[in-house]
Regions:
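N-terminal Sec-pathway targeting helices
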Residues: 1-14
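Blade-level signature of beta-propeller repeat domains, shared across WD40, Kelch, NHL, RCC1
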Residues: 557-599
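Beta-propeller domains
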Residues: 93-103, 132-154, 326, 336-339
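Short loop/turn segments that connect beta-strands within beta-propeller blades
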Residues: 141-144, 186-189, 238-241, 336-338, ...
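Blade/loop signatures of beta-propeller domains
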Residues: 34-106, 255-265, 479-481, 487-490
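Extracytoplasmic beta-rich repeat domains
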Residues: 110-121, 150-170, 192-210, 248-289, ...
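Repeat-blade elements of multi-bladed beta-propeller folds
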Residues: 78-82, 115-136, 158-182, 206-227, ...
Length: 599
């Protein structure tokens, strides 16, 4: 029946396009056609394979007691996008361990009965498991998958229909929307408490990020940096009321920009953007989540690509937006109370490949005593910075990197790796304190891009997609992807002090999901083929795996309910850009066979 519906969807979509409905309803028709396309491309998808390799030149790290375990959250909960606001993703739970993980099994499943770009970073707090879709927020029993409540919101869809999860603070939940708002809900009932607009929907700006919340403030920004005129902003809101406490521009404020709140102090001006007339400064959206150093009071904000994403030129500059294009592709450090600028780390100066800083950085103290910030953007590298002096300690490749210096010229197709949806995506690296290893999941997928000429770029209307790709095919707006039979995924385990990899795992599907190490010596993650894995954290060897029936691109978390450890996974990701199997969005809860919570 599903196959028949998919083929009918193909016919309806093509008929609609030929009748001109695509122009009238581009979001809806792109979504329908994209689902049909994904179905066709995923036919005969192979079973998952995962192969681990040890680095012969660098022996595996010795297991020692943890030196930097962030205790800012209850051990049995997972109360924030990356468990704690320092984003380490490490769990101190150890009931599921290397000796018994082979007994892991699916205990229950909650089916949302919707096709969705299900990227939600799940949270579990106060005996409730919370997640989001593009339009819904829901609360589940974390042991049984029973629905506590589910709240639906109606608003116009966006061409990039994602939501990456909720935040929790003081009995309230917070999420962003596709029409540019932040919404607050009662944790127990799902009743909406307030709504605050923080972006301009007419410029296709939206709020897909998972907020973080701390000491009365909610931190969140907006995306929209792939659309003409869209700019990234970062905000702090009062948790109780939604009032904007401060705002910070991630791209230069220019004539016509209207702040929504008090502006944090910033040295940024337009001098690093030398755009010609008809090419407004655009980009630097922030679209994943954030990291907070609660002791220092510093907020770390990942910034997205400059726009147009692809421009004529290369390493020496371009004709469309000369300069370094600050603060695009940067981690910007702000005073968490005031929004004042403190520092920035510019990872991809003058980006012409669409290589956002696409995930929150992690903050750790390494075994060697260094205070380190590590981050893995879409350029296929893991970066480590010493926070004592902001110096770069290492920049190491963690996926395939090819032909990245080739300039873009109108009329010429350029093939490069990683592509615009390659490298590190929206889930952060993780840290294993016992072995001093940083774990990073990566996408190995190459693209070809042919850029538009400057005259065409200037003619694009404000608020329209502004990638710079010359293509009539709507699925090639962000470049033409290689066949999915040629894609892959990696998990790299890298020494946090040196940047040298200790072990690496290669999957035949991209790895986008959260990566979660535990005190039981186990690492959990999944791939876009729906394969869920448990590895030995010390050497990367596969201990257990199971296909969960849909692409895994969201939260992978672990928590305990009445003393029994559980693992929850967001499964069933479907999106135009990814040729995955078409499955409804689900939350899958796993535990040990025969293990029941304490009464």
């Amino acid at each position: 029946m599903r196959k028949m519906l998919a083929f009918v969807g193909v016919l309806v979509a093509f008929a609609a396009i030929s009748g001109g409905l695509y122009l009238a309803f581009p979001v809806q028709m792109s979504t329908n056609l994209g689902l049909a396309r994904s179905y066709l491309l995923s036919l005969n998808a192979p079973a998952g394979t995962a192969t681990t390799q040890q680095n012969p030149a660098s022996p595996a790290s010795a297991y020692t007691p943890a030196v930097d375990v962030d205790a800012s959250a209850q051990t049995e909960d997972w109360p924030s996008y990356n468990r704690t606001v320092k984003s380490q993703r490490y769990s101190q739970l150890s009931q599921i361990n290397t000796k018994n993980v082979g007994r892991l099994k699916v205990l229950c499943t909650y089916d949302l009965e919707k096709f969705a770009a299900f990227e939600s970073g799940l949270i579990m707090v106060d005996n409730a498991l919370i997640g989001t879709t593009q339009f819904d927020i829901f609360s589940l029993d974390p042991a049984t998958c029973a629905e506590n409540w589910r709240t639906h919101e109606d608003y116009p869809p966006n061409l990039l229909p994602s939501n990456r999860g909720p935040a929790y603070l003081d009995g309230m939940l917070f999420r962003g929307t596709q029409d540019g708002r932040v919404l607050a809900y009662d944790f127990k009932t799902g009743k909406r408490l307030w709504a605050t607009t923080i972006s301009d929907a007419t410029l296709s700006e939206s709020v897909p990020s998972a907020p973080i919340a701390f000491e009365g403030l909610v931190y969140v920004g907006n995306s929209g940096g792939d659309f003409k005129g869209g700019k990234g902003h970062m905000y702090a809101l009062q948790a109780k009321t939604g009032k904007i406490v401060w705002e910070f521009y991630l791209a230069p404020k220019t004539d016509g920009d209207a702040p929504r709140g008090p502006l944090g102090a910033s040295p940024l001006d337009a001098s690093t953007w030398k755009n010609p007339p008809g090419m407004p400064i655009s980009g630097s959206g922030t679209w994943t989540s954030y990291t907070l150093d609660t002791r220092a009071g510093l907020l770390y904000v990942p910034g997205g690509n400059p726009s147009p994403d692809f421009v004529q030129g290369g390493p020496e500059g371009s004709s469309g937006r000369e300069g370094q294009n600050l603060y695009s592709d940067s981690v910007v450090v702000l005073d968490a109370k005031t929004g004042d600028y403190k520092n920035h780390f510019h990872l991809v100066p003058h980006d012409w490949h669409d290589w956002d800083v696409s995930n929150p950085p992690i903050l750790i103290q390494t075994r060697g005593g260094r205070q380190l910030m590590a981050v893995a953007p879409k350029d296929g590298h893991l970066y480590g910075f010493d926070l004592a002096d902001s110096s770069l300690v290492y920049r190491v490749p963690v996926t395939r990197v090819e032909n990245v210096d080739a300039p873009f010229v109108p009329g010429k197709s350029v093939h490069f790796c990683p592509g615009p949806v390659g490298g590190g995506e929206w889930n952060s690296p993780a840290y294993v304190p016992e072995t001093n290893l940083i774990l990073v999941g990566e996408v190995d997928w190459c693209y070809s891009v042919t850029v538009q000429d400057d005259k065409t770029l200037r003619g694009v209307p404000r608020g329209a997609p502004w990638t710079g790709m010359a293509a009539l095919n709507p699925f090639h707006a962000f470049g033409a992807a290689d066949r999915s039979s040629d894609w892959a995924g990696w998990v790299y385990a890298v020494d946090a002090d040196t940047g040298v990899w200790k072990w690496r795992l290669k999957s035949n599907y991209p790895i986008v999901s959260g990566i979660t190490p535990t005190a039981g010596g186990v690492v959990f993650f999944g791939d876009m083929g729906g394969n869920f894995y448990a590895l030995d954290a010390g050497n990367g060897e596969k201990l257990w795996s199971q296909n969960l029936g849909g692409a895994l691109a969201g939260g992978v978390i672990t928590y305990a309910v009445k003393g029994a450890q559980r693992v929850a996974v967001a499964a069933g990701f479907t999106m135009v850009a990814w040729p995955t199997k078409i499955r409804t969005a689900k939350v899958v809860i796993l535990g040990l066979d025969g293990d029941t919570p304490n009464q």
